[in-house]
Amino acid sequence: MKLSALSIIFGMILVMTIMYTKAEAEAEAEADADADAKAEAEAFWGTLAKWALKAIPAAMGMKQNK
């Protein structure tokens, strides 16, 4: 009987450890995906701002020359 109870306890600990490890890995993957999405958005807006800073003065110069 004692061996059977110990086996059940060991099995429960093993399952809990696996579930915890899986949850931790999923949380880490989600955090990485969020960081990648944020970096991608920042890169997009940064590129757009650089383009606008170059295009606006050029467009204003074209209006003044006419």
From Swiss-Prot:
Expressed by the venom gland. Pfam families: Antimicrobial_4, Pilosulin. GO terms for cellular component: extracellular region; membrane; other organism cell membrane. Coiled coil: none annotated. InterPro entries: Antimicrobial_4 (IPR012523), Pilosulin (IPR049518). Residues 24-43 form a propeptide. GO terms for biological process: defense response to other organism. Residues 1-23 form the signal peptide. Keywords: Antimicrobial, Membrane, Pharmaceutical, Secreted, Signal, Target cell membrane, Target membrane. Its main location: secreted. It is found in: Secreted; Target cell membrane. Belongs to the non-disulfide-bridged peptide (NDBP) superfamily. Medium-length antimicrobial peptide (group 3) family. Ponericin-W subfamily. This is M-poneratoxin-Dq3a. The lineage of its organism: Eukaryota, Metazoa, Ecdysozoa, Arthropoda, Hexapoda.
